[in-house]
Amino acid sequence: MKILYLLSAFLFLAFLSESGNAQPQCRWLDGFCHSSPCPSGTTSIGQQDCLWYESCCIPRYEK
């Protein structure tokens, strides 16, 4: 029964760091994490702190 307490604590900590609570670096750059190619009007700047299958998309600013 002791293993259930440890397992539930581990799962709680694992879900605490899921997306929505993560990606501060991408959001600080006015970006968002996207799993497919970035939408039009945005450009990819790499993975940053997104999940392994996502890239950080930021708006393209016209000059």
Swiss-Prot record:
It comes from the Eukaryota. Disulfide bonds join C26-C56, C33-C50, C38-C57. Highly expressed in pancreas, heart, liver, brain and kidney. Expressed to a low extent in the venom gland. One of its GO terms (cellular component) is extracellular region. Its main location: secreted. Residues 1-22 form the signal peptide. Keywords: Disulfide bond, Secreted, Signal. Transmembrane segments: none annotated. It is found in: Secreted. This is Crotasin. It comes from Crotalus durissus terrificus (South American rattlesnake). The gene is Cts-p2.
